[in-house]
């Protein structure tokens, strides 16, 4: 299923009833947990979170841990961005605006001091350079998939952040917090995708570090 996260549960139930395999790209944590519960009685394989993040970045991070006998930190970063950013946001909604709003507003699951905990989205900003390109990174929800459950007690720190062109996070905080758009997620998504529609020339940046 490549549908927005809020439509995936119905598709998953249909796959479960038909006894066929199910895959999706969702980043939504409650949706994922519901599908994993379905998988316990499914005849087919049910695998949510098979996209870029969660999905690919988790595979990269997990692979890197194979070179270590003891883990201190797993730091994962992903940015899907327009190659030629315009305006102050420097962004284009090349995938579900509902999903972007979701990951900007929901709490983020991380491991800190060896234990799973929740932290706010759009926080803990950092500067990062990818091949000389200046980007910012900040916490967003859902990017780790089920990695926290996998690595709890095995690593001191595990976190995921989204990368954007500098200044994006501050503007998004203003949009959601100061303008109270967090209270109307549907309208927020419509406004954002209308302002920053999809583009053909996009690029994905990935950064994974394991200590």
Label each region the model flagged.
Residues 42-82:
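Adenosine-phosphate binding glycine-rich loop
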Residues 8-9, 84:
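Glycine/Thr-rich phosphate-binding loops of Rossmann-like dinucleotide-binding domains
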Residues 1-8:
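Rossmann-like NAD(P)-binding element
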Residues 29-30, 53, 124:
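Conserved beta-strand edge residues that scaffold enzyme active sites
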Residues 9-17, 21, 25-48:
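Rossmann-fold NAD(P)-binding glycine/threonine-rich loop
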Residues 67-211:
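C-terminal catalytic/substrate-binding lobe primarily of soluble NAD(P)-dependent oxidoreductases
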